[in-house]
Amino acid sequence: MAILMLSLQLILLLIPSISHEAHKTSLSSWKHDQDWANVSNMTFSNGKLRVKGIYYRNADICSRHRVTSAGLTLQDLQLWCNLRSVARGQIPSTL
């Protein structure tokens, strides 16, 4: 979920000051060489960012660390987020 929120914050930073009227952006992609997502079919209206056809229903956030290490640091922890995406009108499948 943190990755998704960070992505949305980056998208909002890339959109120049937008009034509360409906606008469409012409963003196509950013930082593709650093695994950032491509952006298409997006609208921003009344403070809401909408992406047609993709909705995130469930997110599982997990963490893992080495059991044998005595003094854990942040570098020893691993955090990942599993997102299940479904198109409009479909039932999400399990991971």
Swiss-Prot record:
It is found in: Secreted. GO terms for cellular component: extracellular space. Glycans are attached at residues 38, 41. Its main location: secreted. One of its GO terms (biological process) is positive regulation of extrinsic apoptotic signaling pathway. Gene3D superfamilies: 2.60.120.40. SUPFAM superfamilies: TNF-like. GO terms for molecular function: cytokine activity. Residues 1-19 form the signal peptide. InterPro entries: Tumour_necrosis_fac-like_dom. Keywords: Glycoprotein, Secreted, Signal. This is Putative uncharacterized protein UNQ5830/PRO19650/PRO19816.
